[in-house]
From Swiss-Prot:
Primary gene name: ERD15
UniProt name for this protein: Protein EARLY RESPONSIVE TO DEHYDRATION 15
Function recorded in the entry: DNA-binding protein that binds to the NRP-B promoter to activate the NRP-B-mediated cell death response. Functions as an upstream component of stress-induced NRP-B-mediated signaling to connect stress in the endoplasmic reticulum (ER) to an osmotic stress-induced cell death signal. Exhibits transactivation activity in yeast.
Organism whose genome encodes this protein: Glycine max
Main localization of the protein described in the UniProt heading: nucleus
Upper classification of the organism: Eukaryota, Viridiplantae, Streptophyta, Embryophyta, Tracheophyta
GO MF entries: DNA binding
Ranges that cross the membrane: none
GO cellular component: nucleus
Keywords: DNA-binding, Nucleus, Stress response, Transcription, Transcription regulation
Length: 125
């Protein structure tokens, strides 16, 4: 059997590289030697100088949002937080009497048979 390995893609097209990764700086040989030889410099550069292209818009995020929420939480804690036992209210309405079985009218039927009205089909001859 013959395997078809032809493709409709352009073989002469340049390789696709996303824009975020196209602007990579070309570092010198001295820099690469320093990164490989000095763990301190490698850690420093990754921690202080490296910027991941995925997280370029860090300025748009507000890191002080917790301070605003703390003020609102303190206000909410003081207002309307009285404890009410709902279980007591539920059992008071029972009355302590016997449980009543539901009446037949209230029960939903298990099987419902639709009432069919037979109609003659009139077809021309």
């Amino acid at each position: 059997m013959e395997v078809i390995s032809a493709s409709s893609l352009n073989p002469n097209a340049p390789m696709f590289v996303p824009l975020a990764y196209r602007t990579v700086e070309d570092f010198s040989d001295q820099w690469w030697n320093l990164v490989h030889s000095s763990p301190w410099f490698r850690d420093y550069w990754l921690r202080e100088c490296f910027q991941d292209p995925q997280f370029q818009n860090d300025d748009a995020f507000d890191f002080d949002f917790d301070l605003d929420l703390q003020d609102e939480d303190e206000k909410e804690r003081k207002e309307g937080k009285e404890v009410v036992s709902l279980g007591v209210l539920k059992w008071r309405s029972c009355g302590g009497g016997w449980a009543q079985a539901p009446r037949y009218v209230e029960k939903a039927p298990k099987f419902v048979k639709p009432k069919v009205s037979p109609r003659a089909i009139h077809q021309p001859r």
